[in-house]
């Protein structure tokens, strides 16, 4: 198609050029005939000669100025095409170096039950129960209560210090986010030699993976190395609202991260004075919302769009160069014709 368009454009331009040349030759023949009719001894008048020369001069100027303007326009188009190619390549490289972070949300009806790893130390677990929406009032705080949670105990070596053995209580977390399921735990610490009392905990994505893991010690060491740990203090009810964030790494792996919002409420201790020496811990775990946040880096540079744009720019450059070359040839040919006619007219007048 491109070759056909070029051939047709060249044919049209050559036909116009031949027509211009034929018109100029016809004009010259008519001038010669008028001179012959007037006779060899009679010269044309000065007024008619000056008028015809001025008309020819104006036509020659127009014929010379038009190709120059056309070449200037083609050069301007070539400069714009070169700048467009450079800018396209630069933008493509910048987009490859700096991908854009994309955040999307996926709604779920229920979550996989997360694992809650608690490190109570000397504290004793008094009760653990699943509730929905609300927590009933405490009947006997500080005393053992219902234990309807799935729990596992495991001892493993601290991955950051090989000389420390840690004892973890693994509790199955809530699942039914639409029903606002929550897990309420109560601990009691009788005596402590420390100035401040707190229990550490960490969250990992799936309690079922922990149960099915053939190496639970290695699983917990990997979780402690990958996830952050938090604390909740005694004498308060700490409400933890969890949210799940999945991040896609560059190598294609998917990393899971827990984000949480905590609210702390003071516990009004109404126990007898003899029992107040024991510190009580209350903690609630609940899902914040049914949306999983997915984060990944997206490269916005589209190679096909860039290739198409570059092809169009190079095609424009090629067409501009071809038209400029043809215009220069046409201008040179017209100039030669004009000089030839001028020489013939001068020799004829002389």
From Swiss-Prot:
Glycans are attached at residues 155, 162. It is found in: Cell membrane. It is a multi-pass membrane protein. Residues 86-301 are extracellular. It catalyses: chloride(in) = chloride(out). One of its GO terms (cellular component) is cell surface. It comes from the Eukaryota. Coiled coil: none annotated. GO terms for molecular function: pH-gated chloride channel activity. The modification Phosphotyrosine is found at residue 10. GO terms for biological process: chloride transport. Its main location: membrane. The modification Phosphoserine is found at residues 9, 14, 24. Keywords: Cell membrane, Chloride, Chloride channel, Glycoprotein, Ion channel, Ion transport, Membrane, Phosphoprotein, Transmembrane, Transmembrane helix, Transport. Residues 1-64, 319-350 are cytoplasmic. The chain crosses the membrane at residues 65-85, 302-318. InterPro entries: TMEM206. Belongs to the proton-activated chloride channel family. Chloride channel gated by pH that facilitates the entry of chloride ions into cells upon exposure to extracellular acidic pH. Involved in acidosis-induced cell death by mediating chloride influx and subsequent cell swelling. PANTHER family: PROTON-ACTIVATED CHLORIDE CHANNEL (PTHR16087:SF0), TRANSMEMBRANE PROTEIN 206 (PTHR16087). This is Proton-activated chloride channel. It comes from Pongo abelii. The gene is PACC1.
